From Swiss-Prot:
ATP 1 binds at residues 366, 406, 408-410, 511. Residues 353-559 form the MCM domain. GO terms for biological process: DNA replication; DNA replication initiation; DNA strand elongation involved in DNA replication; double-strand break repair via break-induced replication; mitotic DNA replication initiation; premeiotic DNA replication. This is DNA replication licensing factor mcm7. It comes from Schizosaccharomyces pombe (strain 972 / ATCC 24843) (Fission yeast).
């Protein structure tokens, strides 16, 4: 009986090499200027002749001229070069490790001579190779060869096909994917130090001086001991080989751990992790906390040491990285496109950018306009200053939201952690002091004690959102004190003494001491946070849930609309999507506003007044927060953030007024609760007072009636936190009462009896 057989379709590698050579030498693309993407070329004038350029031959020429050391082979180019030949593309994706070597061999064969004079003193390997060539001129030809890995001055990587390809999650990887080129999405949880990895080991004989090379392709190898040269064999000398470190070739190596995202984990499961190996030029391309798509070759690796004895036939798996794509890029790395720049210019021309951006933050959450404005300033941030003596003044803004349950504090925190390029969300009960700062761990690769960053380190140059801030243990909460002002974390444990950067903004949410706010107890006792911590927050919002027929009705309508239509109610403008908000903030953060002399004097007077108000509140037992010199810095930081939103390099008095208004509004609900007479002041009367004060500020010129334009009133009223509807209702109400008069089609407003209302 004949044994069953199967027909394995083994690719013809010689034929594949011919196709690869043809692709590398003949693939051309339209010429792209520096800083532009390929897709932007289609926007050029239709009448221009496209200038085609050989893409990969140019890359090889740069490598030959020592101007580059990376070849990125985009498999989209291979598909575009010959769409009918899908077999080669399939072979590469299913057996990528073998085709890396084939592409490298073809690149070696096509490597052009340098077109510029090369200085061989740049690298140690160049000097050694030059000496080897001179030495081998008189040696037998069979001993003149060098391993290809030794002579290659480049790293070759594949970029996967992007069309109709959905990234894998870690738990979706199967045995059938081994050896394949694939893309995995996850969050980076740990990165090791970059270490040299041996790829070609060089030995020198102590008897005859013969040089032997050994290519290393696995974790472990057996070093050569006896010289294989003919001279030693003839003389029966058995020369001993010694490793020559400077003549060997090392590649930078970094091990990275990625973990599944929250939305990839099934119900009741815990996130899985995957080890990723980075070699060569792509090391240091990811940081802990980054959400990335990593493309690479999924490979098995046997366990070593004692773990091999326990594992038996089991093997571990890892991903050999070829390409890294950041899902959410940092503000400095966001690529500007003509479309995004045009959208930003259109947004600026429309006016009220501050209002539109604030309303675009969590639009499905009703109200909280002033809270959203403060969160917008948190995203933009102030200007970090470094003085000549090394002193550093932080520019990041810290905000604390405290108040009754059910006012959407946690939802706002969740949204900010997602819209920020680097956002970490954690809770007070689920976080320890070590989990927030740094923990000492044993590195599984080197077996050394290393530091692993916590939530605050992961949020470096980003935002750390801490929910249930009041429920943290006091010993854990003290770990945040240094971060909130000095923006560093000092570690001294397990023989490691160092300082880590934690240049992060803190956004905290807390409930009052008794669950709900108790108006019979002083405000400072309701909050139950130490004064040293409260003073580090630039602005502290107290959000009380007080019954109000009008507000409750609007809130209920808003919530029911969201549940009916799965979207927020229609606004007078289209809310900006998070990506557009990131692009605008990225442009705004390029400005570094300065504070002129007149604004400095104005801020000084405002700060002195705040201190006087605090003294009065302490006497009346209405103290809400401590006014300290840090409050002065907070005003300046928020003013700088507002100037950045205007794309201005100067802070104006209006910016300081808005910062002071936000500080006042943050505790307005408290004063409304303490002062029952304040409930008698309606929204319309507040807006009327603003209009009256504006009219009083106009100088009285004999023969001219004092009037205001609707545009000026609208800008002032909206800046105070009111809406367009509030303004229209106020003007209509006071016009019906015979107090105001509108002219010029409603664009000009004046008082019917100016003298009477100037006195009131």
């Amino acid at each position: 009986m004949a044994l069953p057989t199967i027909d394995l379709k083994i690719p013809e590698y010689e034929e594949c090499q011919h196709k690869i050579t043809d692709f590398l030498s003949h693939f051309k693309q339209e010429q792209v200027q520096d800083g532009q993407q390929n897709q932007d070329i289609s926007m050029s004038d239709a009448g221009d002749e496209p200038f085609l350029k050989s893409k990969y031959m140019d890359i090889l020429q740069k490598i030959s001229n020592r101007e580059s050391n990376v070849i990125n082979v985009d498999l989209n180019d291979l598909y575009e070069f010959d769409p009918s030949d899908t077999q080669l593309l399939h072979n590469i994706e299913s057996n990528a490790k073998r085709f890396v070597e084939l592409f490298s061999q073809c690149a070696d064969a096509l490597m052009p001579p340098p077109t510029v004079e090369i200085n061989y003193r740049n690298e140690v390997l160049d000097v050694i190779m030059q000496q080897r060539v001179q030495r081998n001129e008189n040696i037998d030809p069979e001993h003149k060869g060098f391993p290809p890995e030794l002579t290659r001055g480049y790293d070759l990587y594949f970029r996967p096909v992007t069309r109709n390809k959905k990234p894998f999650s870690v738990r979706d990887l199967r045995g059938e994917n081994l050896g394949s080129l694939l893309t995995v999405r996850g969050i980076v949880t740990r990165t090791s130090d970059v270490k040299p990895s041996l790829t070609v080991n060089a030995y020198t004989c102590d008897r005859c001086g013969y040089e032997v090379f050994q290519e290393i392709r696995q974790k472990t190898f057996l070093p050569m001991s006896e010289c294989p040269s003919d001279e030693c064999k003839k003389n029966d000398a058995k020369g001993q080989l010694f490793m020559s470190t400077r003549a060997s070739k090392f590649l930078p190596f970094q091990e990275v751990k990625i973990q599944e995202l929250t939305n990839q984990v099934p119900i009741g499961h815990i996130p899985r992790s995957l080890t990723v190996h980075l070699y060569g030029a792509i090391t240091r391309s990811v940081n802990p906390g980054d959400i990335v798509d990593i493309s690479g070759i999924f490979l098995p690796t046997p366990y070593t040491g004692f773990r091999a004895m326990r594992a038996g036939l089991l093997t571990d798996t890892y991903l050999e990285c070829h390409y890294v794509s950041q899902i959410i890029k940092n503000y400095t790395n966001i690529e500007k496109t003509p479309q995004s720049e045009a959208a930003i210019a259109e947004l600026n021309q429309g006016g009220n950018v501050y209002e539109k951006l604030a309303k675009s933050i969590a639009p499905e959450i009703y109200g909280h306009e002033d809270v959203k404005k403060a969160l917008l300033l948190l995203l933009v941030g102030g200007v970090t200053k470094e003085l000549g003596d090394g002193m550093r003044i932080r520019g990041d803004i810290n905000i604390c939201l405290t108040g009754d349950p059910g006012v959407a504090k946690s939802q706002l925190l969740k949204y900010i952690s997602k819209v920020a390029p680097r956002g970490v969300y954690t809770t007070g009960r689920g976080s320890s002091g070590v989990g927030l700062t740094a923990a000492v761990m044993r590195d599984p690769v080197t077996d050394e004690m290393v530091l692993e960053g916590g939530a605050l380190v992961l949020a470096d140059n980003g935002i750390c959102c801490i929910d249930e801030f009041d429920k943290m243990d006091e010993s854990d909460r003290t770990a945040i004190h240094e971060v909130m002002e000095q923006q560093t974390i000092s570690i001294s444990k397990a023989g490691i003494t160092t300082t880590l950067n934690a240049r992060t903004s803190i956004l905290a949410a807390a409930n009052p001491l008794y669950g709900r706010y108790n108006p019979k107890v002083a405000p400072i006792h309701n909050i139950n946070l130490p004064a040293a911590l409260l003073s580090r927050f630039d602005i502290l919002f107290l959000i009380l849930d007080t019954p109000s027929r009008e507000t409750d009705e609007h809130l209920a309508q808003h919530v029911t609309y969201v549940h009916m239509h799965n979207e927020q109610p229609k606004m007078d403008f289209e809310p900006l999507d998070p990506n557009m908000i990131r692009h605008y903030i990225s442009s705004a953060r390029q400005y570094r506003p300065v504070v002129p002399k007149d604004v400095c004097d104005y801020v000084t007077g405002a700060y002195v007044q705040l201190r006087q108000n605090q003294k009065r509140d302490e006497a009346n037992e209405r103290q809400f927060a401590h006014t300290t010199p840090r409050t002065l810095l907070a005003i300046l930081r928020m003013g700088q953030a507002l100037a950045r939103l205007r794309f201005s390099n100067r802070v104006e008095i209006g910016d300081v007024d808005e910062a002071l208004r936000l500080m006042s509004v943050s505790k307005s609900s408290l004063y409304d609760d303490l002062d029952p007479s304040s409930h008698d002041t309606t929204i319309t009367s507040k807006i009327y007072k603003i209009i009256r004060d504006m009219l009083n500020s106009i100088p009285d010129v004999e023969g001219n009636e004092r009037s205001l334009t609707l545009r000026a009133i609208r800008e002032r009223v909206l800046a105070k936190g009111f809406t367009e509807d509030h303004l229209i209702n106020t003007i209509q109400e006071y016009t019906d009462l015979g107090v105001l008069l509108t002219t010029n089609n409603g664009q000009t407003i004046m008082f019917l009896d100016p003298d009477l209302h100037m006195e009131n």
